Structure formats: C-alpha cells, structure tokens
Amino acid sequence: MISKKVVLPLVFSAPFIFFFVLCIVVVMTISRENQVGDDFIGGGDGEYETVGIAPEVERFRAVFEKYARQEGVFDQVNIIMALTMQESGGRSLDIMQSSESIGLPPNSITDPERSIEVGIKHFKKVFKQAGGDVRLTLQAYNFGSGFIDYVKKNGGKYTKKLALDFSRLQAFKMGWKSYGDPSYVDHVMRYVKGSDKNVKPVKGSMDFYETVMKEALKYEGQPYAWGGSNPETGFDCSGLVQWSFAKAGITLPRTAQEQHGATKKISEKEATAGDLVFFGGTYEGKAITHVGIYVGNGRMFNSNDSGIQYSDLKSGYWRDHLVSFGRIK
C-alpha cells in the first residue's frame, strides 16, 4: 500500500510531466521545421554532369560528397567540383582556395580535406544568400557576397553585364586595375554540361509536353517563391506546374495535394515525360508536399528551395521522399 506521503507528490507531478513532454514535442517540431527551412536545400543541379575534372580533384569526390551532404547541398557536388577546377585544378593543398573565407591569408590551409570542408561551408552560405541561383552563387564566391546585394538592387537576377559592371565599380573604388574575375561563371561552367534551354522531343512523351516545358524553362534558375503562382510573384512547386500546364490549355488545381488528387496514379515504369511526380514529408504539412514535372530518364523539372531547375529522382533526397507518379486525366 502506497502511503499518502508518496501518492501526493506523484499526483502533483503529473502536470509537470505533461508540460515537460509537451515542451520536448514542441522543440522537436521546431527543430524539424528549421532543418527543412534552413539546413536542407533540396533539389539542386542534378542536370549538371562534370566534364574534364582533373584526377587531382576527382580523387576527392568522396570528400566533396561527405561535406556537401553534411551542409545540405549534396545536389550541388558537381558544381562545387567544377568550381574547384577553376580555383586550383587540384594543384594546391588549399584545393578550394577557401582560406580567405575564414579570414586567413591565401593558401594558409594546407590540408585538402580541411579546404573542402571550409569551402563547402562558404559555398552553402553564399548559395542561401543567392536564393539558390547557381550562377549568382558562383560569381559571389569569386567577388564576395557584396555582389549579391548589388544584383538585388539591379534587377535581382545574375547577368554577365552585372558582373562586368560590379568588377569595374569595385576596381575604381579600390584604385586597382581590375577586381575579381567577371567571367568566373563561364570559366566554372566549362567543367559541367547542363540542360538545353531548347526543349527536344522525348519519345513517348505526352502531346503537350513540349509546350509545357517551353514555358517552364523560361523560369529556370529563378528562386523558389512560397505561394507564388505567376511570373510576377515567382513560383512555388505547384504554382509552376499549374502555370506551365495552363499554357498547353490544361487546367490544374492550385496545390500539390490537389494536383495529386486530379491525376490518375501510375507506376514509375509507366511514367513518361509530361506526367507529374509527387512527394511527401518535404516539410510539415499535408500528405503530398511537393510536385514536379517528370521529364524522363529519372529526372524532373521543379521549383524547390534551391530554385527552379532539374532534379534527379534516382537517389538521394527526392528518391527518399517520392510518393507516386500521376497522369493528367
């Protein structure tokens, strides 16, 4: 028999236990939301494949992947390795030339893995500041983050002209003959092959596919815009799908969940270019939280936290969250 002396503390502690458990749940929820919103940058540049990467850089691929995954920019690995080719070509121990990003003199870092760790942290920081715009990220990696502010004040989108103007302006301010490399983006992109802006016919694709993709590709590289559904506001995932399909005379509902309900479910083997692909768990919300346009060969075109771009469905984040494929009824 339990005495009153013992029972009373147990009874009165129950509310405190409940409150304690509730606090833990709230903290875990907030932590998850922060992870999705801040630490993970989904999607990325699965359309980019490396070209001409030197063996001195390629041998560190596993290291690049390790820290890119750790920083939430795994889908940018090929871009980061292309950047490294431009920075050092693998001919320096400070392989990503990242010493200056932590306030050290050039080439202070003498361990390639440390250089990659620091360089990818810096890349991730700049990538977020650039809103997922890969070209703006690359140029800012060379110029410094001040270039991002300059672009935001001058149209909000990277152009080669802005890079040239910024270089001249900074050189004048500093009293130097030149400032940075205004052609840095071109120099990095030599080492990757990416998507073709011209939509090519895909065997077995839906009749409307070319019209849809011709419209969608107009916005490639633009940042993700929560709640956006037109060119003026920018696009979120379902907004891009709805807008692009409307250009082919196809009316779709607004949200990813609703678009999922408006399509006929098909298997991955049945899926062809022009079908939709749906995902769950990309943030705390409904069962279906993301949608993309399937383009064939295990890839989709979509608007995600990394911007409007192609993404790989074969492995990684999107594979883990894939729910189903759908065909327009």
From Swiss-Prot:
Gene3D superfamilies from the UniProt entry: 1.10.530.10, endopeptidase domain like (from Nostoc punctiforme)
Additional detail: The cwlT gene is located in the region of the mobile genetic element ICEBs1, an integrative and conjugative element (ICE) found in B.subtilis. Exogenous CwlT causes lysis of B.subtilis and B.anthracis, most likely by causing at least minimal degradation of the cell wall.
Entries under Pfam families matching the protein: Lysozyme_like (PF13702), NLPC_P60 (PF00877)
UniProt keyword terms in alphabetical order: Cell wall biogenesis/degradation, Conjugation, Hydrolase, Protease, Secreted, Signal, Thiol protease
Protein name, as recorded: Bifunctional muramidase/DL-endopeptidase CwlT
Enzyme Commission number(s) from the entry: 3.2.1.17, 3.4.-.-
Effect on the protein upon substituting residue 115 to A: Retains 10% of muramidase activity
Role this protein plays: Exhibits both muramidase and DL-endopeptidase activities. The N-terminal region acts as a N-acetylmuramidase, which cleaves the bond between N-acetylmuramic acid and N-acetyl-D-glucosamine (MurNAc-GlcNAc) in peptidoglycan. The C-terminal region acts as a DL-endopeptidase that cleaves the bond between D-gamma-glutamate and meso-diaminopimelic acid. Cannot degrade purified B.anthracis peptidoglycan, which differ from those of B.subtilis. CwlT is required for ICEBs1 conjugation: the muramidase activity is essential, whereas the peptidase activity is partially dispensable for transfer of ICEBs1.
Signal peptide per UniProt: 1-29
Any single Gene Ontology cellular-component annotation: extracellular region
Summary of pH dependence: Optimum pH is 6.5.
Effect the entry attributes to changing residue 23 to A: No detectable change in conjugation efficiency
Example of a GO biological process term: peptidoglycan metabolic process
CDD domains according to UniProt: CwlT-like (cd16891)
Species of provenance: Bacillus subtilis (strain 168)
Gene: cwlT
Keyword Secreted: yes
Residues covered by region (Muramidase): 59-192
Mutation effect (residue 101 to A): Retains 30% of muramidase activity
Catalytic reaction equation(s): Hydrolysis of (1->4)-beta-linkages between N-acetylmuramic acid and N-acetyl-D-glucosamine residues in a peptidoglycan and between N-acetyl-D-glucosamine residues in chitodextrins
Enzyme active site: 237 (nucleophile), 290 (proton acceptor), 302
Family from the record: Belongs to the peptidase C40 family.
Top class in the EC scheme: hydrolase
